[in-house]
Amino acid sequence: MLARMNPSKVIGLVALAEKPGLGEALRIMRRELSRHGLGSCVIETPDALEQAIVRCSMLVTFGGDGTMLTVSSLAAAHHVPLAGVNLGRLGFMTTCSVQELPLLAYALQEGSFLTDERSMLEVVRMGVDGIAVPPRKLALNEVSLIRAQSGKMVDLDAEIDGE
């Protein structure tokens, strides 16, 4: 269980894709967070997310699993907890529905929630000299590798916990 949210920081509300019901969901969440004394900021682009994440004590994504996957690597790199509001159909990874936003805001204010640490995949491209070439990338669930040129062999090493 986590302690109360840091009042000097804000809850980042991440809305990267226009979805039906998004505007209403953001309005409800901002109202509920304000009722509980928590500040918030709406983040609508990946560039804005990279700038805002340092001010956020928590990120709440609005969309579905795709939005969660998009945001997860940056959240993990900054050690910022992530919750998801399902605006789509399935939302296996999301935390709650729009109807549950008042409960989510209350839980954030009270610190009455648990975090589930997920294993992340780290992708590192190595140069011919054996030195890592920046940037390293984090991913949740899966990684796709694509050859730069067709007809060439790909040399791939995979490690799990250094083995």
Residue ranges and their predicted role:
Residues L90-E163:
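Catalytic core of DAGKc-family lipid kinases
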Residues N86:
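Divalent-cation-assisted or electrostatically stabilized phosphate/pyrophosphate-binding catalytic cores
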Residues H79-P81:
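Proline-centered loop/turn at the N-terminus of a beta-strand
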Residues R30, S72, D155:
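Short glycine-/small-residue-rich flexible loop motifs, especially phosphate/cofactor-binding loops
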Residues G66-V71:
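Short glycine/serine/threonine-rich phosphate/pyrophosphate-binding segments
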Residues R27-E32, A76-A77, I160-D161:
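Short, solvent-exposed amphipathic alpha-helical segments in soluble enzyme
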Residues M1-M58, F62, Q99-L114, R125-K137:
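ATP/NTP phosphate-donor binding region
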Residues A25-R27, S72-A75, T95-S97:
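Short amphipathic alpha-helical segments
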